[in-house]
Amino acid sequence: MSVLINEKLHSHRLKWRWPLSRQVTLSIGTLAVLLTVWWAVAALQLISPLFLPPPQQVLAKLLTIAGPQGFMDATLWQHLAASLTRIVLALLAAVVIGIPVGIAMGLSPTVRGILDPIIELYRPVPPLAYLPLMVIWFGIGENSKILLIYVAIFAPVAMSALAGVKSVQQVRIRAARSLGASRAQVLWFVILPGALPEILTGLRIGLGVGWSTLVAAELIAATRGLGFMVQSAGEFLATDVVLAGIAVIAIIAFLLELGLRALQRRLTPWHGEVQ
């Protein structure tokens, strides 16, 4: 009888497993430790609350600015909507223009010879270095902000599309042509699927660069946006609003990255498999 009970207990232990992976568990543990240290430093007043308010104060302020009271004549959701609108418009423009440009560069040495020097000349320059030019040429309105974000996203997207085309195995292209496929069919059914993993990776990189550029671009003559909210709060020494805004910026960037990763896994399930 005791043997049966021990076997059942042993099998029960074997069936139960920690639901989270080791990496996720370590990440959550790290965040918990950081929050605990932050709370302890604030509770012991090792740093003035003016410079480092406690986590509960930041959370309370976040809930306040998310409500009707808002901050700087707009709620948190209105600031967030303004930022997301800018990044989405710039990302769509980079996708519509950057991917075809990268594919054309990968397929045509002539096109690559014309466009590659231009992209390689402007790509190493930090996007914010172009901000004064954008303001001079396009004013301080929305166009300059969206165009600056587009400039930041375009190069990673175009160069990733180029790398994706170059990574397609030539034997597959020759096999498709030998079976009578037209150029359009080879492009659509062979080259694009083969280049898609690199293209999506470029989108992830470009979105990260574009999001950081967006926050900086909103410091210039903006009336709404997460960057504007953080900058305005800093001018009034509202550290709790600054930290709340930084937390929202980080969370949105993390969610966008997770979304693109999920899209990449769905569209390219074969990526990473041994060919």
Language-model features, listed with the residues they occupy:
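Alpha-helical membrane-protein architecture signal
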Residues: 59, 73, 77, 81, ...
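Periplasmic/extracellular loop-to-transmembrane helix junction in inner-membrane transport proteins
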Residues: 44-92
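Transmembrane alpha-helices
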Residues: 147, 151, 183-216, 240, ...
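Transmembrane-helix boundary motif in ABC transporter permease subunits
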Residues: 89-119
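Generic hydrophobic transmembrane alpha-helix motif, especially the helices
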Residues: 120-156, 163-164
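Glycine-rich helix-loop "coupling/hinge" segments at transmembrane-helix boundaries
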Residues: 136, 164-165, 212-249, 268-275
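Short cytoplasmic-facing helical segments at TM-TM junctions of multi-pass membrane proteins
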Residues: 160-205, 226
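Transmembrane alpha-helical segments of polytopic membrane transport and secretion proteins
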Residues: 1-32, 258-275
